[in-house]
Amino acid sequence: MARASKREVSSDEAYSSEEEEQVNDQANVEEDDDELEAVARSAGSDEEDVAPDEAPVSDDEVVPVEDDAEEDEEDEEKAEISKREKARLKEMQKMKKQKIQQILDSQNASIDADMNNKGKGRIKYLLQQTELFAHFAKSDPSPSQKKGKGRGRHSSKLTEEEEDEECLKEEEGGIVGSGGTRLLTQPACIQGKLRDYQLAGLNWLIRLYENGINGILADEMGLGKTLQTISLLAYLHEYRGINGPHMVVAPKSTLGNWMNEIRRFCPVLRAVKFLGNPEERRHIREELLVAGKFDICVTSFEMAIKEKTTLRRFSWRYIIIDEAHRIKNENSLLSKTMRLFSTNYRLLITGTPLQNNLHELWALLNFLLPEVFSSAETFDEWFQISGENDQQEVVQQLHKVLRPFLLRRLKSDVEKGLPPKKETILKVGMSQMQKQYYKALLQKDLEVVNGGGERKRLLNIAMQLRKCCNHPYLFQGAEPGPPYTTGDHLVTNAGKMVLLDKLLPKLKDRDSRVLIFSQMTRLLDILEDYLMYRGYQYCRIDGNTGGDERDASIEAYNKPGSEKFVFLLSTRAGGLGINLATADVVILYDSDWNPQVDLQAQDRAHRIGQKKEVQVFRFCTENAIEAKVIERAYKKLALDALVIQQGRLAEQKTVNKDELLQMVRYGAEMVFSSKDSTITDEDIDRIIAKGEEATAELDAKMKKFTEDAIQFKMDDSADFYDFDDDNKDESKVDFKKIVSENWNDPPKRERKRNYSEVEYFKQTLRQGAPAKPKEPRIPRMPQLHDFQFFNIQRLTELYEKEVRYLMQAHQKTQMKDTIEVDEPEEVGDPLTAEEVEEKELLLEEGFSTWSRRDFNAFIRACEKYGRNDIKSIASEMEGKTEEEVERYAQVFQVRYKELNDYDRIIKNIERGEARISRKDEIMKAIGKKLDRYRNPWLELKIQYGQNKGKLYNEECDRFMICMVHKLGYGNWDELKAAFRTSPLFRFDWFVKSRTTQELARRCDTLIRLIEKENQEFDERERQARKEKKLSKSATPSKRPSGRQANESPSSLLKKRKQLSMDDYGKRRK
C-alpha cells in the first residue's frame, strides 16, 4: 500500500464534491444521449406511420365516409405527436450542448484555480534546492516587495495583526511542506509490474507535481519513459481523483505506440487519437473530443499546430511533449504554439542527452518556468565565462539549475537485468565496379579534393562517395537494364552485400531476428529486392510509410511465432518510438554523421523486454571515407560524455572543411593503386573475429583520446578532432601526385602537316601480337515512361535483339582467338535496315520531351478546363505550344489505358468535367431567369414557396443572383467583396459578416429554386404551345368571298399596303 501524507487525504476531501458534480454531469449527458437516440427512433417510427398510403384504390372498393374522417383525425393526431417529439428532441439537443459547455467551463475553472494555487510554493521549493534561483526570482519582485520606502522601524508600516498573520502562514507552509507523497507500490490501475527505477521515477514526477514544478524526463532510450508518464497520470486518477484532461504531443510515428501503451498499462484512462483528414478530425471534434468524454488527447506536432483553435478551448492538467528536443528553438512555430495552450503542468520527454548550449538550455527552462527564466540576456550574463578558471564553476552552476527539473538515468546504471549489448565493426573491401565509380568521383572534382573547393562541394563529394560504398546501383545507369532483374549481380557488385549475404544465413541458423538500418531509402529498395531473391520474409518502414501500415508492420513482426526474419528501417524514420525487442541483431548498413541517431536505432532492440544479448554489426568499407565517418562518430560520443563530465560549453556540432577534406582523401592511394576487387573469400566467423579485434583497437584509441582531451585546456583555436596521429601522417601524402599518376588522359585530336606513305605502311605491316578485341558498345535503351506513349513492347524486342547479337558476336570472336573451334555456333541475325528504321520511327513517335511534371500539369489542366478546351490547357503548360498539347491530347484520348493508374486519372478528369458541366448548367439557368426581366437588379423575384428563410431578405437574394451571373459561379471571394463594398448593405451587419461558405450555401439554395421555377415555366410554355396548336387544327379555314375572288392580284396588293399604312398611323398616334 502507498504511504500518503495527511495533506494528501485532505486534498482528496477538498475536491471530492467538485469531482462528484462533474461525474454526475457526465452521467446526465450520457443519459441524455440514450434518451435522444430513443426519441429519434420513436420519431422515425411515427413518421413512417404518418406517411400516406400510396397503394392505388380500386373503383369497386367502397370507403365509408366515417372511416375517412377517423383516419384523418388519427393522421392529424400522429402528425401533432411527431411535431412535438421533434421539438422536444431539438430542445434536448440544445440542453445537451449547454450541459457539455457547463462541464467544460467548470473543468477549465477548476484547472485555472489549481494553476493559481500551484505557483505559491514553487519559488520557495526552488530556493530550497539551490540559491541560484534567488538571482532570477529577484528580477520579478512580489507586490509586498514593491511597497514604498521609509525610514526607521516604521518604514514597512506593517501592523501587529498583519505580522502575526504572516507568521502563521509561514508556519503552516512549513508544516505542509514537511510531508510528501512517496509510493512504495505502484497504482492499482496500472497493469503489469513497474521496475524499481521506474517506481523511483514515478515518485520523482509526483514530487514535481506536489511542488508545482514542470520537469524533463530524460532517461536513456529503452528505460520505459512512456510507462512512467502513464503511471503519473494513473496516480492522479487513483489517488487525486484527477481524470484530466491531459494532452500528449508526439511525433506522428509514435502516436500508435502511445495509444497501445495506454490501453495496455492503464485501460481505465480514456484516450483519443486526434489525427486524420479534415472529415475524420471533424468527427473527432464533435463526438469524441468533448468535455467529460475523454481523459487523454494524443496528437502529433502537426495537428497541434493545425488544430490549435480546437485545443485551446480546453484548459489542460498536463501537456506532455515527447521528443522534446523539437522545441529547443523558442522561435519555431511548434514552440510558439505549445506556449499558447493553458495548462497546469508541462512535462518534456527526451531520450537524447542535453548539450550544454546556453541558449538551448534557456529555451527549455523558459518553457518550463517562464515566470522565472523570462530573459535570455539575464541568463547569458549570469553564466558568462570571464576566464578559463571559471569554466568548472559555470558548469557546476548549470547542473545546479537543471537538478530540480531533470532526471536522466542510463541503462548501465539502473537496468542490471537487461542483457548486454555488443557492437562489432565489420570491415569489407570494394568490388571492381565500386572502385571504378569511387575513382571516377575523385577524378571528377580534382580541384575540390586538392583543397580549393567550398565546404558545400566537399559535402556533396562525401555523400557521393558514401553512396558508392553502399552500392553502385544507387547511381543512375549503373544497374544493367531494362529489363531490370534480380540475381547474383545485386550481391557481387557491392562489398557490403557480399558481407550481408554471408552473415544472414548464419543468423538464420541460430534463430536470430534482424533489424537492418540505412539512411538511404533507395538502398532499402535494393535490400528489398535482395531479400525477395533469397526468399527471406521481411517488413519495411521508411519515411513514406503511413501510420496504419507502420503499426501493422510492427505488430506482424512482434507477434508470437512470427515468420518475419528481417525488418528494414530507415535510420531517421524508424529510429524513434518503435519497440522491436523481439529482434536480437541490429545491422547498421551505413553510419550516420550524428552518433545519437545510430544509438536510437540500436535501442529499438536493446530495451526493456529483451531476453537475448543484442549484437550490433556496423558495416564499414575499409580504406574509404566510411572508416573516418565511424571514427568521428566514436569521437563525438566520447566528447558528449566529456561535455557532461568536464563541462565543455562550446562543442563542435558540424564537420568542418578540413575534416571533410581528410575524410575524402582517406584511402585514395589504395583505391588508385589497384583496379581489382578487394573483397575477400574469408569465412564469416573469421570476418567477425577480425571485426572484434578492430573494434577493440578503436575502443582503446578512444580511451586514449578521452584521457588526452581531459588534460587538454580550453582553447578556441584548437580542434577536438585532432587527436589522431594517422591524420597527421595522412596530411603529408601528396594527393595530387597519386591522382596524376593514375590519371587516364582522354584521347587528343592531332593534325599532322606531312603525311608519309612509307611510315604508314611500316606501322600497318609491323609484326606483333594481335590486339585484344575491344568489347562492343552495348546500345542503351532510353528510359521510357508510360505517359510518354512509346511502343515499349516493340522497342524492347528490337533492343534485346540488337544486344543479343552484339554479345554473341563478341563471344564468338573471343572463342575464335583463344580456342580452335572447327565450326562455331551460328550467331543471331543483326537488325535489318527496316528494323533500324522502325526503331528510329518508334523513338520519334513518343513524347520524349514530356516529363512527369508536364504530364501532371496536363492532367490538372484537364480537370480544371475539360479535355476539349485545348487552348486553356495549353495556357497552363509551361514550355509547350498549343500544337504540341493538341497532339498529346489526341494520343491521350486513344491510349490513356496504357497508363499504370489510368482509372484514377480518368475518374479525376471526369469529376472535374462534371463540375464544369454543372457550372455551365447553373449559369444557363440564371441567365434564363434574368432574361425574363427588363431590369433584374430591381425587378427580379424568386418563388420561395413556403421555404423562405428568415435570415436573408429578398433584396439580398436578388443582389446575390445578379452578381453570380456577372462574376460567374464559384467566385465566392469576389461575391463576398461585392457585398462588403455595395452601398445597399452598408448597415447590414448580418450580410457583411457572412463567410464564403455560407454565401455559397445560400446561392446553391437559390439556384435550386430557380431551376425548379424554370422547369415549371418551360412546362407552361410547352402546354401553351400544345393548346395553341390544337385550337388552330380545330378552327375551320375561311374561304374568300366571290368579290375578292374576282379582284385582280394588283388591286389586292394595293389594299394590303393601304391597310398596313393605316395601321401604322394608328399605332403612331
From Swiss-Prot:
Catalytic class of the enzyme: hydrolase
Tissue: Highly expressed in growing tissues such as inflorescence and flower meristems, young leaves and floral organs. Expressed in roots, rosette and cauline leaves, stems, flowers, inflorescences and siliques.
Limits of the Helicase C-terminal domain: 499-650
Stored PANTHER family: CHROMODOMAIN-HELICASE-DNA-BINDING PROTEIN 3-RELATED-RELATED, SWI_SNF-RELATED MATRIX-ASSOCIATED ACTIN-DEPENDENT REGULATOR OF CHROMATIN SUBFAMILY A MEMBER 5
Gene3D superfamilies (UniProt xref): Homeodomain-like (1.10.10.60), iswi atpase (1.20.5.1190), ISWI, HAND domain (1.10.1040.30), P-loop containing nucleotide triphosphate hydrolases (3.40.50.300), Tandem AAA-ATPase domain (3.40.50.10810)
Null mutant phenotype: No visible phenotype under normal growth conditions, but the double mutant plants chr11-1 and chr17-1 are very small and display early flowering and sterility. Premature decline of expression of HSA32, HSP18.2, HSP21, HSP22 and HSP101 after HS in the double mutant plants chr11-1 and chr17-1.
Biased composition (Acidic residues): 15-37, 45-78
Enzyme Commission number(s): 3.6.4.-
Keyword Transcription regulation part of the UniProt annotation: no
Keywords: ATP-binding, Chromatin regulator, Coiled coil, Hydrolase, Nucleotide-binding, Nucleus, Repeat
Protein name: ISWI chromatin-remodeling complex ATPase CHR17
Domain annotation Helicase ATP-binding: ranges: 206-371
Domain SANT: 845-897, 946-1007
Annotated Polar residues bias: 1032-1051
Protein localization: Nucleus
Compositional bias of kind Basic and acidic residues: 1-10, 79-93, 1059-1069
Compositional bias segments (type: Basic residues): 146-156
Quaternary structure (record): Interacts with RLT1. Binds to FGT1.
Protein's GO biological process: positive regulation of cellular response to heat
Family: Belongs to the SNF2/RAD54 helicase family. ISWI subfamily.
PROSITE patterns xref list: HELICASE_ATP_BIND_1 (PS51192), HELICASE_CTER (PS51194), SANT (PS51293)
InterPro entries attached to this UniProt entry: Helicase_ATP-bd, Helicase_C-like, Homeodomain-like_sf, Isw1/2_DEXHc, ISWI_HAND-dom, ISWI_HAND-dom_sf, P-loop_NTPase, SANT/Myb
Protein purpose: Possesses intrinsic ATP-dependent nucleosome-remodeling activity. Constitutes the catalytic subunit of several complexes capable of forming ordered nucleosome arrays on chromatin. Involved in the formation of nucleosome distribution patterns. Required for the maintenance of the plant vegetative phase. In association with RLT1 or RLT2 may prevent the early activation of the vegetative-to-reproductive transition by regulating key genes that contribute to flower timing, such as FT, SEP1, SEP3, AGL8/FUL, SOC1 and FLC. Necessary to acquire heat stress (HS) memory.
Species, as recorded: Arabidopsis thaliana
Keyword Lyase: no
Ranges where the record places region Disordered: 1-93, 136-168, 1016-1069
